[in-house]
Amino acid sequence: MSYKFLYQNAQIKSRESKLLTAQAVQRLLDAADAREASKALAELGFGTDGENFDVVFKRAEEENIALLKEMNEGGALDAFIVESDYVNLKILLKAYVSGAKAESFAPNGLFEVETLKEAIESGEISLLAKQMQDVILKTQENLASGQVKAHALDVDVDKAQFAHQLELCKKSGKVAKEYFEKRINYLKISSFERARRLGLDFTFFADCFI
C-alpha cells in the first residue's frame, strides 16, 4: 500500500470526524438568530465567531473541491468534481436568459467558470462535454422561441449533470455508479412527493423524471 494512499485516507478520516452530527444540526436549527448560529458553527470548527455564513460555506466548498482534485488519480473522481461545473452552468444559463449578471459561483470543477461563460456567450461550445453542449443549445433554442421556463431549465441542467456523471463513472467504478443511481432515485421520489403535495398533474412529475 502506497504512502500516498495512506495519506489520502487519513485526510478523509480527518474530515469525517468533523462532519456535523444530528445533535449539532439540531443546535443550529435551535439558534435564536444568525449571530447565535454563527457562534455555534465556530464552536463546531467551522469558521470563526461572527464570520459571514457565505464566507464560511464558500471556503469549505473550495477546500473540498481542492481535496478531490488532489486525490483525483486517473480521473476517478471526475464524476464528483464535475457537479461544481453544473452548478456554475445553471447560474450562467439563468443569467443568460434573464439578462442579469451572474454572481456567486461554485469553485471551478473540471472547467473554468470563464470557459463556460465564454462558450455560452459566443456559441463556441466544442470544448465542453457533450451533455453541456446539448443543454446550452436547448436553452438557446428555447430562448429564441420564447419557451424558456426557470423550472424547466433547472430540470434540463440536472438531467445533463447526471447523464454526464454516470458516463464519468466508467473511470470511477461500480460503487460510484451505484451512488449516483441512488441519488437519482431519491430525487425522483422527492419530485413525486412534491408534485403530490402541490396537487400537480402527472405531466409535471414526468417532466422532472431523470
Residue ranges and their predicted role:
Residues 1-210:
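N-terminal domain-start signal
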